[in-house]
Amino acid sequence: MIRRQLDLFEGDEAELIAEVREAERAYDKAPREDAEAAYERLWDMVETGTELLAELRDAYMRTLDEGTAEQYEAAFNRAVKKRLPRFALQITDY
């Protein structure tokens, strides 16, 4: 189930994922005076992706009993860390 959910996320949010990669490259190449602005742009996009993933996770969790939901949440978060690490840093905060 989680694999399919992440497949859908990657398909639906392919543009966001590509923009995050580009923003990461721009941040890495930014001169010192532009680095803060580049990082803020990158962080905003990462935060958007993380929120979208958390919404996907939470919507499915609401269909599960409490014990199963906790196991699913942990498994989902691990899968995000492995498959979409850019969006995993704060996934547990949402």
Set out the residue ranges of the language-model regions:
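Short terminal alpha-helical segments
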Residues: M1-K29
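Non-transmembrane, amphipathic alpha-helical segments
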Residues: M1-L8, A30, D34-R41, T68
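Generic structural signal for well-ordered, non-transmembrane alpha-helical segments
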Residues: D7, A14, E40-A54, A74-K81
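Residue-level signal for secondary-structure boundary elements
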Residues: A14-I17, D28, R32, A54, ...
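Contiguous, amphipathic alpha-helical segments that mediate oligomerization or scaffolding
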Residues: E19, A23-Y60
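Amphipathic alpha-helical binding modules
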Residues: R62-Y94
